[in-house]
């Protein structure tokens, strides 16, 4: 799966929100179970396809992704899991949507701090030098 981390993070946030909604509507549904094995339905698909972030950073997902494709994408995210070096030691619990979202959130912060902000700073300094 070659998807930007910010798009993956958004997808996980939308999935989490949907699981919470389902658990609140139907008290017989256990939220912890949904977090380990989330329900991916048309509501998640529509939210994902129409989100501005997806339109900007992953326009191919706005056009081409079906419900089956979105389910496969989420399954792949769960299958990839969290790298061992990023997990807390001794954690043998099944990975949840929250765990994955936290991991991708930290990954995105690192991308911003180590890549995008320095590039932006360099571009601003270059522009400023040309103005002087």
Curated annotation (Swiss-Prot):
One CC-aspect GO term: nucleus
Signal peptide: none
One record GO biological process: regulation of DNA-templated transcription
Superkingdom, taxonomy of origin: Eukaryota
Protein location: Nucleus
InterPro entries: SWR1_Swc7 (IPR020195)
Keywords: Activator, Chromatin regulator, Nucleus, Transcription, Transcription regulation
Miscellaneous section: Present with 4240 molecules/cell in log phase SD medium.
Function, as annotated: Component of the SWR1 complex which mediates the ATP-dependent exchange of histone H2A for the H2A variant HZT1 leading to transcriptional regulation of selected genes by chromatin remodeling.
Subunit structure comment from the entry: Component of the SWR1 chromatin remodeling complex composed of at least ACT1, ARP4, RVB1, RVB2, ARP6, YAF9, VPS71, VPS72, SWC3, SWC4, SWC5, SWC7 and SWR1, and perhaps BDF1.
Family: Belongs to the SWC7 family.
Protein name stated in the entry: SWR1-complex protein 7
